[in-house]
Amino acid sequence: MTRASSFRLDATSGKARTGVIQTPRGDIRTPAFMPVGTAATVKAMMPESVAATGADILLGNTYHLMLRPTAERIANLGGLHSFMNWDKPILTDSGGFQVMSLADLRKLTEEGVTFRSHIDGSKHLLSPERSMEIQKLLGSDIVMCFDECPALPADRKALDDSMRLSMRWAARSKEAFGDRPGYALFGIQQGGLEEDLREESAKALREIGFDGYAVGGLAVGEGQAAMFGCLDFAPDQLPTDKPRYLMGVGKPDDIVGAVKRGIDMMDCVLPSRSGRTGQAWTRRGQVNIKNARHADDPRPLDEDCTCPACRNYSRAYLHHVFRAQEMISGMLLTWHNLHYYQELMQTMRDAIAANDFAGFEARFHADRAEGDIVPL
């Protein structure tokens, strides 16, 4: 990484890795899960509450922040950390995925992507240079290069063309990023599910040189089996002495499978989005708190969980406030889900340090196979 930032690999267990990404704003223990703060907030959570779950780093969305309140406004107000009251590291995505999935009337050229805002219809150009400028204005600690993320399935020619465009954009991103001591720039591997295209992409990224490397273009509709098939080779194509980031993943079993295959970092809106829709994640799997079976249940979501929702509230209460559409429902379930995710990451870090990831994985799947506790 650039000066004052580094990656230290501490232990391995099979392909699973544990270590520390050291940044001027603090250490990021890996494997790490990054809660998503789309619009400079993790929905339904105070920043100090997110930190209390054990999160070392948040993710911010370049596309959303450039449109509202604008990167220039955030910079004038002291940068994203100050703006959202988060003093730990922040990673920002490049905006490419959201442009291709959310924006209206988009046009893709060699220069970048011209699009109209989904908010007010205003016209914008997002290019490698503009993405680097926006992320610098935001002041994020880890910056992602600008790429195109094609939806799967896609034919080979489309994947090949897209990958080559992303590699040209990666080189432009690196040049535009410049020399920024203490800040890191990650490249993004593309190539769909094709091993040779992934290798060609990884080779191009290695030649450019980045502080970390993401496996991009997965979790876009291909299904878990296909994703794991790709992860059986894609992380191995990336440098071993740099962090590896799987973008947009995911469910707990996706995360465990990714770590097993050598991934160090992940992000996903799932734990917070699920919390707002009455879904809780526990070591036994998913709990739908809206179901009538919970209406008279005095037990916690998970008797072994130490989050505020499990320490202080019953399933009956959580069922009631969700059915009554009270704001505290989303707050408590989101806190629980983020706490569960961070506990999962810590358990994996401990297992890797003890060279027992296989044992952890067996226990993880055995717990989930039991299913939720029996109704009263």
From Swiss-Prot:
Zn(2+) binds at residues 305, 307, 310, 336. Binds 1 zinc ion per subunit. Substrate binds at residues 93-97, 147, 190, 217. It comes from the Bacteria. It catalyses: 7-aminomethyl-7-carbaguanine + guanosine(34) in tRNA = 7-aminomethyl-7-carbaguanosine(34) in tRNA + guanine. InterPro entries: ArchSynthase1/Queuine_TRR, TGT, TGT-like_sf, tRNA_ribo_trans-like. NCBIfam families: Q_tRNA_tgt, tgt_general. This is Queuine tRNA-ribosyltransferase. It comes from Jannaschia sp. (strain CCS1). The lineage of its organism: Bacteria, Pseudomonadati, Pseudomonadota, Alphaproteobacteria, Rhodobacterales. The gene is tgt.
